[in-house]
Amino acid sequence: EMFALLLCGTANAQNITEMPSRLKTFTDNLGTVYASYTQTKTLPESTKTFSANGTVKFVKGVGFKWKQQKPNAFEFTSTLDSYCVNDDTQALSDLPYFSQIQSVIKDMLDGDMSSFITAFDADYIEDKKGQNWTLQATPKISAIKDFLSSMTLAGNTKDLKQMVIAYKNGTMIIINFKRMKTESADEIKC
């Protein structure tokens, strides 16, 4: 539904040079979030759609823990300086593209759009009467654009509702989020 805002053009898109007000309200309100997610993945060489679901816990300024429940259980945790898949910890510098994206997103969540603007060409859309927004980003720097075609985030002033990731190889991932009222005791550390 949020992605439809971008596709239907119900509002005027603007190129981002500073933090739009609704996006700023969203980042200011973001603290600790626990959400369920559903994910669909399509591969360019297949007509089959792959589905997954699970939970994610995000703590602003700390990182996130992604717990997939189906089809296979696994955990991915990202902190400010490391990441781990299940219990295998690695330095974040071992994944330079992910490290760069994580740094850009951290700055953006802290209210600083400068590294985002340096790394991405971005269009931002707000609906005319609600609280919804869509941010579509196309990478400008080679560390990111060598593998990523675009990333679209959609939400409102309280929640991220959807993320769409399009990779250079044609793979497309659509993730829908739903905030949960219960808190997770999961620690975000590797």
Predicted regions located by residue number:
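Hydrophobic h-region of N-terminal signal peptides that target proteins for export
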Residues: A4-A13
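N-terminal leader/targeting segments and the immediate start of mature chains
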Residues: N12-K48, K189-C190
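One face of beta-strands
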Residues: G31-Q39, A52-V56, F64-W66
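A mature extracytoplasmic/lumenal domain signature
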Residues: Q39, V62, Q68-N72, L80-S82, ...
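Short, mixed charged/polar active-site loops
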Residues: T47-N53, A73-E75, L148-S150, M172-I174
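An acidic-aromatic
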Residues: T55-V104, I173
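Short, solvent-exposed helix-to-loop capping segments enriched in aromatics
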Residues: Q100-F116
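Gly/Pro-enriched, hydrophobic low-complexity segments
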Residues: M113, I117-C190
